[in-house]
Amino acid sequence: QINKKKLPLMDTVISAVNCTYPKADEKEIEFVFDYAKELETCMVMQDKRWLGEAIINVLDNAVKYSPEHSKITIRLQKRTGFVRIEIEDQGIGIPQSEYHKIFQRFYRGTAPEVREKSGTGIGLYLSRQIIEQHGGTITVASGKVRKGSTFLIQLPENGLS
């Protein structure tokens, strides 16, 4: 059950990064933050636990499929009507033909690098469900295969300050 309160979005993002940090540290992956100062105090209607879980799922995948000594960039941007969280990795990328599939329950990519890693294929499905319950969307953009992926989470301006 989602129980939304007006809370700082940055706190939720930082908590999610902190949960993912040990795995990233093992691979010497650096987290890079990119945001305007005003976003440090940006308040969003959210269930911190559940929204944090949605972000953790995306970050876990970014760490899992990124090479050692790479970086994951987390951008926060305030736009008209919404706030956007971008999570960009330097991993294996996602073929465009799979964009519509990766948010389906139990779907796992077809690349050999995906198959050799453990996973159930439920993380991104749950992230989408949680984000949609927050009135938001999650999409993916990938460069060329093996050039990383960028996940875009958009949350409504409703509750922003």
Language model segments and positions:
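Short conserved segments within the C-terminal catalytic ATPase subdomain
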Residues: 23-35
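Short helix-loop "hinge" at the ATP-lid/N-box region of the Bergerat-fold HATPase_c
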Residues: 62-63
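A conserved beta-strand-to-alpha-helix junction within the catalytic ATP-binding
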Residues: 3-18, 30-32
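Conserved glycine-rich
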Residues: 136-137
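Short alpha-helical Gxxx[C/S/T] motif in the catalytic ATP-binding
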Residues: 123, 127
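Short conserved segment of the HATPase_c
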Residues: 94-106
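Conserved micro-motifs of the catalytic ATP-binding
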Residues: 1-4, 41-46
